């Protein structure tokens, strides 16, 4: 499983965005675990790919500046940000997502900091008036995150104990 994850991340890095999206769809739509596959499927009745996103990552991406756990993680996060900004749809997902795939806390699809980040996710959902499993455009989501959390100075209430908090405090949100 570990080797499959490494190969998956290496495959991601050598694929162009359009090829990656096809790879992504095959990777998740063809999953054996249908409950997990449902989180990654195309939107109802369309061929448009809907990318799962942990709600708290809407805040992480607002302040992301190329720092992170490793060079591989930051390259992956930067590429995911580009993909999301192309107008993709997301499905709010309180579990590991594609950003998590390059994180050292991801162990076989489960986050070692699972309880803490699930609290972050649920707090973002609550403050934004959204629900787990909800599908929307990334831009709609970031607008809610900016208006309901970041502009209201509520970020620290949600994730002030995050190890990356100082990065967020140093700069302005890219969603502003």
Language-model region placement:
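Short hydrophobic targeting helices and cationic amphipathic motifs
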Residues: 3, 24-25
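Long, hydrophobic N-terminal alpha-helical segment
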Residues: 32-83
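Immediate flanking context of iron-sulfur cluster ligation sites
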Residues: 47-55, 87-104, 134-160
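Local cysteine-cluster metal-coordination motifs and their immediate loop/turn environment
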Residues: 56-68, 97-113, 154-172
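Short cysteine/histidine-rich zinc-coordinating motifs and their immediately flanking basic loops
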Residues: 71-75, 112-117, 171-176
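Mid-chain, well-packed structural core segment of small domains
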Residues: 107-141
């Amino acid at each position: 499983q570990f080797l499959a994850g490494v190969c998956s991340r290496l495959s991601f890095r050598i694929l162009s965005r359009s090829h990656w999206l096809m790879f992504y769809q095959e990777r998740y739509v063809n999953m054996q675990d249908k409950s997990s596959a449902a989180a990654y499927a195309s939107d109802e009745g369309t061929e448009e790919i809907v990318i799962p996103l942990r709600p708290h990552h809407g805040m992480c991406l607002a302040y992301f500046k190329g720092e992170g756990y490793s060079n591989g993680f930051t390259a992956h996060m930067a590429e995911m940000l580009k993909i999301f900004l192309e107008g993709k749809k997301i499905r709010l997902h309180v579990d590991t997502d594609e950003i998590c795939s390059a994180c050292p806390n991801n162990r076989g699809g489960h986050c070692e900091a699972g309880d803490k980040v699930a609290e972050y996710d649920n707090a973002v959902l609550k403050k934004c008036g959204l629900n787990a499993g909800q599908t929307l455009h990334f831009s709609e989501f970031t607008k809610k995150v900016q208006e309901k959390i970041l502009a209201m100075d509520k970020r620290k209430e949600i994730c002030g104990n995050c190890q990356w908090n100082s990065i967020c405090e140093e700069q302005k949100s890219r969603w502003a």
